[in-house]
Amino acid sequence: MSKKLTFQEIILTLQQFWNDQGCMLMQAYDNEKGAGTMSPYTFLRAIGPEPWNAAYVEPSRRPADGRYGENPNRLYQHHQFQVVMKPSPSNIQELYLESLEKLGINPLEHDIRFVEDNWENPSTGSAGLGWEVWLDGMEITQFTYFQQVGGLATGPVTAEVTYGLERLASYIQEVDSVYDIEWADGVKYGEIFIQPEYEHSKYSFEISDQEMLLENFDKFEKEAGRALEEGLVHPAYDYVLKCSHTFNLLDARGAVSVTERAGYIARIRNLARVVAKTFVAERKRLGYPLLDEETRVKLLAEDAE
């Protein structure tokens, strides 16, 4: 490799590449979440018949993974570059390899492997066929073909490509610690994020108010239900995300037992399923506006039979 791309140049390169493939460039969704998959730009849009092609960076919070800024590769918050394409292009893997070339990684000069790793997210009732992508022995990307989202079968199938930006940048810049990644010219990743990493880790493991979090979970769950009773999908899903993050904080604090853990996950999953069903019904009521006219008319006629 010649010039080593900065973190933000990696993002810009991926944005330009997937823009050229017809993806809309979305912005990170303004609610805490554990993965880019949980953004409504993936979770909601992966279900139903309408096409959807989008790419976005998603800061992803995982309280239990915090290490006070002392671990070079494990983080409370990391960044994913998320690509979702529905229906899935037949050449999605070739497009992915081409995107690596744009980053200066020649597939012919490196050991790139697709290792089977089927994906499941119990808290949202989602699952799919998947592969980890290993670059010279290090996982840098997760590939998934969604089979089920929010408890609903997907059709057409959505392809998801999730780049782990910190791992990718560490490889490209040849650094051993995420904190040594150059975010922009002259500015290191650690200069931006090491203090937040320490503080969020301390909060998640030592300081968070368990009683408050338990109460908040119940309140968020109730409010999601109220929004759904009014047919308000997006506010309801915001509260599902709040439930998920609150549970993750409780889990990091060790505030829930193994039995209770399963119960909380089931409560989140039940809400997510109702959100998914309500969203599909809403899109049908609106007449599937993202479908081309011929397909839209045909599908609405079939639904009316």
Curated annotation (Swiss-Prot):
Transmembrane segments: none annotated. InterPro entries: aa-tRNA-synth_II/BPL/LPL, Gly-tRNA-synth_heterodimer, Gly-tRNA_ligase_asu. It is found in: Cytoplasm. Its EC number is 6.1.1.14. One of its GO terms (biological process) is glycyl-tRNA aminoacylation. GO terms for molecular function: ATP binding; catalytic activity, acting on a protein; glycine-tRNA ligase activity; transferase activity. HAMAP family: Gly_tRNA_synth_alpha (MF_00254). Belongs to the class-II aminoacyl-tRNA synthetase family. This is Glycine--tRNA ligase alpha subunit. It comes from Streptococcus pneumoniae (strain 70585).
